[in-house]
Amino acid sequence: MTMLEVNGLGKAFTIHHLNKTILAVDEIQFSVHAGEFLGIIGKSGSGKSTILKSIYRTYLSDAGQIIYDSKQFGKIDLIQASEREIIFLRKNEIGYVSQFLNVMPRTTCRELVQNALLEMGETKETARIETEKALSYFEMDEGLWDSYPNTFSGGEKLRLNIAMATVKKPRLLLLDEPTASLDQQSKRKVREMIEKLKQQGTTLVGIFHDIEFMEGLCDKVFDMKSNEMSVVLEGVPHES
């Protein structure tokens, strides 16, 4: 089953003080089946993050379609979807993880994860239980659960970010360069987390600068330079 299909995606940005328009992505096309992991590769500034932010609707694309097979709405074009539909999907079906953790100050690690569930309408008791499960699952030190994230290391912030995004059990998870600026030990932990998500059957679309990190994880690779998608067989991409 095709979970996500991107057809002819285009997005441009206007730099007003230069009176100039820059084309970030153009005619992007790929598809992802349920349970697959698609890795997007390309140089800095090639538009990788623009694609993910267009899927999440942080950016509203100028052209094309982003067809998502929603459990709630059926097949829906995320570009044409209403704000109400997008909010629902973010809360219930689509998660987003970046290298940055933007959270409310003076909110503890535990509270941040619980709030993600309370927004979905879960009871306080269910939110408490599921939060503890998620933090344990991603090996967050229990001594940090009631601490503030501004004291965390980069790896600890990323674990919290992933726990917040996945505690809702999203069907589709977008990973926007989550390993940037992490040391090798933290990267290994992230890889283990992603492997756990794959085992759960989560559909993943991710951006990583480290090609070696992606080896053995991705089912498909989309190359921004060639605008082509390859199927990964025994660690080597082959054109699909």
Describe each model-derived feature in a short phrase.
Residues I41-K43:
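The feature captures the beta-strand-to-loop junction immediately N-terminal to the Walker
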Residues Y56:
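Helix-to-loop junction immediately C-terminal to a conserved catalytic motif
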Residues Q65-F88:
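ABC ATPase NBD Q-loop/coupling interface
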Residues T107-L118:
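Q-loop/switch helix immediately C-terminal to the Walker
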Residues A165-T166:
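ABC ATPase C-loop
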Residues L173-D176:
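Catalytic Walker B motif of ABC-type/P-loop ATPase nucleotide-binding domains
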